[in-house]
């Protein structure tokens, strides 16, 4: 009997996932708030898993694709939570999967520093281990290249090198070395044996039966979420290989039918079936365990669903958003809509905001008022020019049609004569009986009959005045 300390213990472990009918944002949102339960199907990835792993043991996990191997390793490493059952972990856990946790845009050296900081190593410890990690990884000059340029084997080497230099109590290797070359695998195997001799626990998930045989003390065979066998490699591996050979010999249709039947069993699984299995396995503890399972399910909160309080907050935020949108389409303020909601919906909703229009009109009026003096000055200048033009036009018209002139303010007989190209005597001759010693604005006087030279002189004079 093995008296070593138990490092990992799982009892009646299950993991249930909710399957949506179609992958869409609408279905995800409904599932989040819990309104899509009718369309969801329960898929039990793990069903009633129980086992123990002790100090210094290396345990392999084998099975076909979709058997639940990665789900089990993720639960043990704490990345996801189980649905029912208990998982007891005694020690620090480190997991390595092909490229797991790697930041593709960072270099290999930067990834070493990042992962070391995440597990709590100090800068001094990282610096002291950096060269050893790089040397063990065999990446050479590629250590300073971005990880996105690495092959899957190079990523596995880097991840494994980081893990073994963290010195954890429990190491989980999920297909981390299946893509590595034989030289590196042999070196890793030697390192793993050193850890095992130091009393460290190793959980190895792999499809490589050669590695499982060489590394592992015991093997767990998972078959579509159930433990098919758990024991020594020489006992379990032949049974598994026999099953694989049987499966491969089946016609394609029979293989698909087998997979469909097994997956349907995972869909049809229920808590009642779990309780029945517990009773058959251990009648003495059945009542206590059944109560524990029932309590766990009552208290279990699905990680991807919102709690009742969170749902209330989401609905309140949604209502607030809709209300604010309606207020923006009305002529009421937010405070007015809250004080008088009935009036808001019956009289104010979808009405233009007259207050804003009035405010805009007032602003425009102020702008117009402030600019009006400039406009008035401009208009006055324009009026003066028009008046002057009208005067000249009037004078010209008067000269050409009636040979008369209306005296303007500031005019004198000599100025009138000079502007129109006449002499004072010529004007006096056509205005007998008029006393030109005193003339006043508005007075009408006759001008001599225009001649060609006079007209030319008059036009030049008018142009100069303008």
UniProtKB/Swiss-Prot annotation:
The keyword Zinc does not apply. InterPro entries: AAA+_ATPase, ABC_transporter-like_ATP-bd, ABC_transporter-like_CS, ABC_transpr_TagH-like, Bact_Polysacc_Export_ATP-bd, LysM_dom, LysM_dom_sf, P-loop_NTPase. Residues 403-447 form the LysM domain. GO terms for molecular function: ABC-type teichoic acid transporter activity; ATP binding; ATP hydrolysis activity. Residues 27-249 form the ABC transporter domain. Its EC number is 7.5.2.4. It is a peripheral membrane protein. Residues 385-403 have a biased composition (Low complexity). Keywords: ATP-binding, Cell membrane, Membrane, Nucleotide-binding, Translocase, Transport. ATP binds at residues 63-70. Residues 449-466 have a biased composition (Polar residues). Residues 373-384 have a biased composition (Basic residues). Gene3D superfamilies: LysM domain (3.10.350.10), P-loop containing nucleotide triphosphate hydrolases (3.40.50.300). GO terms for cellular component: plasma membrane. It is an enzyme of class 7 (translocase). Its main location: membrane. It catalyses: ATP + H2O + teichoic acidSide 1 = ADP + phosphate + teichoic acidSide 2. Residues 356-403, 439-466 are annotated as: Disordered. Residues 250-466 are annotated as: Unknown. Part of the ABC transporter complex TagGH involved in teichoic acids export. Responsible for energy coupling to the transport system. Belongs to the ABC transporter superfamily. Teichoic acids exporter (TC 3.A.1.104.1) family. The complex is composed of two ATP-binding proteins (TagH) and two transmembrane proteins (TagG). This is Teichoic acids export ATP-binding protein TagH. It comes from Lactococcus lactis subsp. lactis (strain IL1403). The lineage of its organism: Bacteria, Bacillati, Bacillota, Bacilli, Lactobacillales. The gene is tagH.
């Amino acid at each position: 009997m093995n008296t070593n300390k138990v490092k990992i213990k799982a009892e009646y472990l299950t993991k249930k996932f909710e399957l949506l009918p179609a992958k869409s944002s609408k279905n995800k949102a409904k599932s989040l708030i819990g309104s899509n339960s009718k369309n969801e199907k329960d898929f039990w990835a793990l069903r009633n898993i129980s086992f123990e792993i002790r100090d210094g043991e290396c345990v392999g996990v084998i099975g076909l694709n979709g058997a639940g191997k990665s789900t089990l390793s993720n639960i043990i490493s704490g990345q996801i939570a189980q649905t029912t059952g208990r998982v007891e972990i005694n020690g620090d856990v480190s997991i390595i999967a092909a490229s797991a946790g790697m930041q593709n845009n960072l270099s290999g050296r930067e990834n070493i520093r990042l992962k070391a900081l995440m597990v709590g190593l100090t800068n001094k410890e990282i610096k002291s281990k950096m060269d050893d990690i790089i040397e063990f990884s065999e990446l050479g000059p590629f250590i300073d290249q971005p990880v996105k340029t690495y092959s899957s084997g190079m990523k596995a080497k880097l991840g494994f090198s980081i893990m073994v230099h963290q010195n954890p109590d429990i190491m989980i290797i999920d297909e981390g070395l299946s893509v590595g070359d034989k030289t590196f695998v042999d070196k890793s195997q030697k390192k793993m044996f050193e850890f095992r001799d130091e009393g460290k626990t190793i959980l190895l998930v792999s499809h490589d039966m050669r590695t499982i045989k060489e590394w592992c003390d015991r093997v767990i065979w998972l078959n579509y979420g159930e433990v098919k066998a758990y024991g020594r490699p020489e006992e379990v591996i032949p049974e598994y290989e026999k099953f694989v050979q049987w499966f491969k010999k089946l016609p394609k249709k029979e293989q698909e039918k087998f997979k469909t039947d097994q997956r349907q069993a995972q869909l049809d699984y229920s808590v009642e079936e779990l309780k029945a299995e517990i009773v058959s396995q251990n009648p003495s503890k059945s009542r206590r365990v059944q109560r524990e399972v029932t309590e766990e399910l009552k208290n279990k909160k699905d990680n991807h669903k919102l709690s009742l309080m969170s749902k209330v907050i989401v609905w309140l935020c949604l209502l607030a958003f809709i209300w604010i949108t309606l207020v923006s389409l009305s002529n009421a303020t937010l405070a007015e809509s809250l004080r008088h909601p009935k009036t808001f919906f019956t009289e104010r909703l979808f009405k233009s905001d007259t207050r804003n229009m009035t405010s805009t009109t007032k602003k425009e009026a102020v702008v117009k008022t402030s600019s009006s003096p400039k406009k008035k000055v401009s208009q006055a200048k324009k009026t003066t020019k028009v008046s002057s033009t009208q005067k000249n036009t009037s004078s010209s018209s008067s000269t050409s049609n009636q040979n008369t002139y209306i005296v303007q303010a500031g005019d004198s007989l000599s100025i009138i004569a000079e502007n129109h190209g006449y002499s004072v005597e010529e004007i006096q001759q056509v205005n007998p009986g008029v006393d030109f010693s005193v003339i006043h604005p508005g007075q009408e006087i006759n001008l001599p009959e225009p001649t060609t030279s006079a007209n030319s002189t008059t036009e030049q004079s008018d142009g100069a005045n303008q």
